[in-house]
Amino acid sequence: MTSPTRRRTAKRRRRKLNKRGKLLFGLLAVMVCITIWNALHRNSEENEPSQETAAVSNTDQKKEVKKKTAKKSEEQIKTVDRNQKISNYLKEIGFSGTAMIVRNGEIVTNKGFGYADRKHYIQNNPLTSFYVGSSQKALIATAILQLEEKGKLQTSDPVSTYLPHFPNGQTITLKNLLTHTSGINGHIEGNGAITPDDLIKDIELQGIKRQPGVWDYKDSNYSVLAYIIAEVSGEPYEQYIKNHIFKPAGMTHAGFYKTYEKEPYPAVGYKMEGSKTVTPYIPDLSQLYGAGDIYMSAIDMYKFDQALIDGKLYSQKSYEKMFTPGSSSTYGMGFYVAPGSYSNHGVMPGFNILNSFSKSGQTIVILFSNIQNNAKLGQVNNKIYQLLNQE
C-alpha cells in the first residue's frame, strides 16, 4: 500500500508535468502562428505594386512577372535632374510623364513625373513607353526621303505612279502628302481593325475636297505614304522603319502598337474630365497606319532627333528639304518650322507629345505625357526654353 506522502508527491509531479506540457504546447502554437503570419505578410508585400517598377495594364496580370524580370540596365537607369527650376515648374503644373532635355550635348533633365499607372501607383521613369501619335509622321517623312536618296522614288512623283486609282492622283504629288497640301478628304477613323489595303481603298473612295496646294492636315496623307514605303521598299512598312530608322538611330525601346504591352514600362493613358482622371478608350491603331501606330520612350525620340541632326539617317540635302515649310502653316515634312526651332506634336486618347529642337541642334526638349489634356505642351516647351536661357 502506498503511503499518503508518496501519493502527494506523485500528484505534485503529475501537476508539474501537465503545466510543462501546456506551456510547451502554447509555445508551439505561438511559433506556428508567427510562421503563418510571416508567410502571409511576405506574400502581401510581394503583391503590392512598387512605385519604381514597370507600368502594368489594368487587365494584364502578366505585367507583375515582367516587373521582376526586367533587364538590370533598365532597372538601374538613373534619373538626371540638373535644373531645379525646370523640375519645380513641371511639378507645379502637374505634368505627368517623362521630360528629356539636352543642352549643348549635356543631359539637363531625364526624369519621370507623376504616375505611369495610377491604379497600381507605378511612377513614370526615363524609360516609360508612350504612344507618340502624329509625332511619328517625322519618321515616315524620313523614310520617304531615304528612299528618294536611294533612287526608289521622287517626292515630286505623282501619287498615281504608285496608286493608279488614287483620286486626282496624277496631280497630287508625294510632296503634297508630306506637307498636308494634297486636298484629299481622307479616311474617317473607326474603332475596329482594318488592313492597309482596305484603308487605302477607303481613302480613295472618299475622294478629294480641293485641288492640291492648300494646307489641310489629314492623317490619311501619311497613311498613303506608309503604304508607298511598303510598295517601293518591298518590305512591310513596319519592318522598314525598324531596319532603317530604329536600328541606325539606336531606338531600342521603340516599336509598333501590337507589342506595346510587352515593353517593360508601358504607360497607361489618362484624360481629365472635370476633377476626375479617366482612362479613355483607344481604337484599334491599325486605323492610324503610318500616322499614330508607333510608341517609344523619350530617350528614343531624343536619339531620333540627334540622328537627324548628325546626318545618320539621310543627307544634308534631305535635312533641308524636311525643314522647309510647304505652306503658310509652316509645316515642312513631319515638323513645324519656327524662327528658332523645329517641333512636332502628337495627341492621342490618353497621350500628349511634344518634340522640339533648336535650329542649331544644341537644345532638345522632349515632353511625353500620359495625360491627354492637363497641360498645353507648346506653352510648357516655350517656358522651358526661357528657363534654359536664364542659366
From Swiss-Prot:
Location(s), subcellular: Cell membrane
UniProt-annotated stretches for the region Disordered: 44-76
One Gene Ontology cellular component annotation held by this UniProt entry: plasma membrane
Record's bilayer topology term: Single-pass membrane protein
Family matches, as SUPFAM superfamilies: beta-lactamase/transpeptidase-like (SSF56601)
Observed phenotype of the null mutant: Cells lacking this gene display no visible phenotype during vegetative growth or sporulation.
Pfam families in the cross-refs: Beta-lactamase
Any one biological process term the GO annotation gives: sporulation resulting in formation of a cellular spore
Gene induction: Up-regulated by sigma-X and sigma-W factors.
Record bears the keyword Transmembrane helix: yes
InterPro entries (UniProt xref): Bact_CellWall_Synth/Modif, Beta-lactam-related, Beta-lactam/transpept-like
Primary location class: membrane
Biased composition (Polar residues): 50-59
Keyword entries, A-Z: Cell membrane, Membrane, Sporulation, Transmembrane, Transmembrane helix
Positions of transmembrane segments: 21-40
Similarity-based family: Belongs to the beta-lactamase family.
Protein name: Putative penicillin-binding protein PbpX
Annotated organism of origin: Bacillus subtilis (strain 168)
Lineage: Bacteria, Bacillati, Bacillota, Bacilli, Bacillales
UniProt gene name: pbpX
